[in-house]
Amino acid sequence: MTVTIRPAHEGDLPALLGLYAELHPSDPAPDPHTALETWRAIETQAGRTVLVAESRGLVVGTVDCTTLPNLTRGTRPFMLVENVVVLAAHRRSGVGRALLEAAHTLARQTRCYKMQLLSRSSRKAAHAFYESLGFRTIAQGYRLYLD
């Protein structure tokens, strides 16, 4: 399967929402107006790049990359990687690898000293995948949900 990785654009919004519904099936679907406003805020946020994987004209995966300025590590930024998702029918075909390799390239281009991602502790297959790409479990993560 041939996959093209590219920055997402507004026209990808329906496909992105479909991917996110696979990632978090219990989340309510956002209303179209709010989704569009949110996308436009994401699109204009400094340091933010949402990448999509496209195959045969279909968006089959995505990753959300945010490069954050940093006053430590010689002022080198770091990249926060979020919302890594590939359509179920396209998993284990190299799409996720291509997305994270593109994120890695972007991190290097922006001088990041690290890429950081969190994954629910129950997602063992995802953990094995991330480790196959060089990610290591070296810290304990915490979340505080606000609602």
Regions found by a protein language model. Give the residues of each.
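Conserved GNAT-fold acetyl-CoA-binding loop/helix
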Residues: L17-A41
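A short helix-loop-beta-strand connector motif used in the catalytic cores of GNAT acetyltransferases and
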Residues: R40-V52, L80
